[in-house]
Amino acid sequence: MIRQRTLKEIVKTTGVGLHSGRKVTLTLRPAAANTGIIYRRTDVNPPVDFPADPASVRDTMLCTALVNDQGVRISTVEHLNAALAGMGIDNAIIEVDAPEIPIMDGSASPFVYLLQQAGIQTLNAPKRFIRIKKPVRIEDGDKWAEFVPFNGFRMDFEIEFNHPAIDGDDQRLVFDFSSQGFVKEISRARTFGFMRDIEYLQSQNLCLGGSFDCAIVLDDYRILNEEGLRFDNEFVTHKVLDAIGDLYMAGHAIVGEFRAYKSGHGLNNQLLRAVLADQEAWEWATFEEEVGSPVAFAEPNMVLA
């Protein structure tokens, strides 16, 4: 059977919080089968846990943020969550000593590297997938996102930015998920923002950790980063990365096709909630044979460069 996975070792890293600009220590710990992904704030007493669950997401203004009834929060979870999805990790405790996950380089790549350092441990319990059984769609003005049945996990995402630096041909991406494909084609895409927005946010004491080291920054005409883009379609690729992280807030891999036009964290979360609220829209699935699995995860001992 396809089994659940956790980490082999505890791993730690430090980085800067995007909004606070302060140093954050991130610790990833192994967890037992059926624990799920749990985000934990260790700088409050007692520590506060947030299970990976669409209902934990209560703020999607500038990132995906988990917030509890007391207002305790962990922001910017989507890139790490995408890395967990990409590596097929079902169970882990994610500890931070701050109200946000460190931004690192603005992509999921540093988190993939961290997970590879930890190693993957298979557990003696079946991996449970969420299989989409019927179409579900959410619209917001001209933006929309939907799930349709599909024997795999496919992302079909289109953005529409009228900007000289964003080529019209590079605004749509169709990606058939596999761990290898995620690491090579998706994980290195960085978040992006406009200089005028960053300056405004910083005047409001937000985005204090924002810099050319952790984002693609644009003015009205061009990309301001000296090194340019990592690949031509880095903008839409990052939106796919965000969506993979947002959808993994379900706590389980999904078997289905996600289609979106100009979607963002809020719409992604609304769609996930709508699917899970409709008992006819999905079912649990497990797979006896790796060969028969519609979603390809990396072998636990395979190092993905």
Swiss-Prot record:
Class in the EC hierarchy, top level: hydrolase
Location of the active site: 265
Keywords: Hydrolase, Lipid A biosynthesis, Lipid biosynthesis, Lipid metabolism, Metal-binding, Zinc
E.C. number(s) listed in UniProt: 3.5.1.108
Pathway: Glycolipid biosynthesis; lipid IV(A) biosynthesis; lipid IV(A) from (3R)-3-hydroxytetradecanoyl-[acyl-carrier-protein] and UDP-N-acetyl-alpha-D-glucosamine: step 2/6
Cofactor: Zn(2+)
GO molecular function: metal ion binding; UDP-3-O-acyl-N-acetylglucosamine deacetylase activity
GO cellular component, one term: membrane
Protein residues bound to Zn(2+): 79, 238, 242
One family name in Pfam for this protein: LpxC
GO BP terms: lipid A biosynthetic process
Xref: InterPro entries: Ribosomal_Su5_D2-typ_SF, UDP-acyl_GlcNac_deAcase, UDP-acyl_GlcNac_deAcase_C, UDP-acyl_N-AcGlcN_deAcase_N
Reactions catalysed, as given in the entry: a UDP-3-O-[(3R)-3-hydroxyacyl]-N-acetyl-alpha-D-glucosamine + H2O = a UDP-3-O-[(3R)-3-hydroxyacyl]-alpha-D-glucosamine + acetate
Keyword set includes Metal-binding: yes
Function recorded in the entry: Catalyzes the hydrolysis of UDP-3-O-myristoyl-N-acetylglucosamine to form UDP-3-O-myristoylglucosamine and acetate, the committed step in lipid A biosynthesis.
NCBIfam families the UniProt entry points to: lpxC
PANTHER family given in the database record: UDP-3-O-ACYL-N-ACETYLGLUCOSAMINE DEACETYLASE 1, MITOCHONDRIAL-RELATED (PTHR33694:SF1)
HAMAP family, per database record: LpxC
Family named by the database record: Belongs to the LpxC family.
The protein, known as: UDP-3-O-acyl-N-acetylglucosamine deacetylase
Record organism: Vibrio cholerae serotype O1 (strain ATCC 39315 / El Tor Inaba N16961)
Originating gene: lpxC
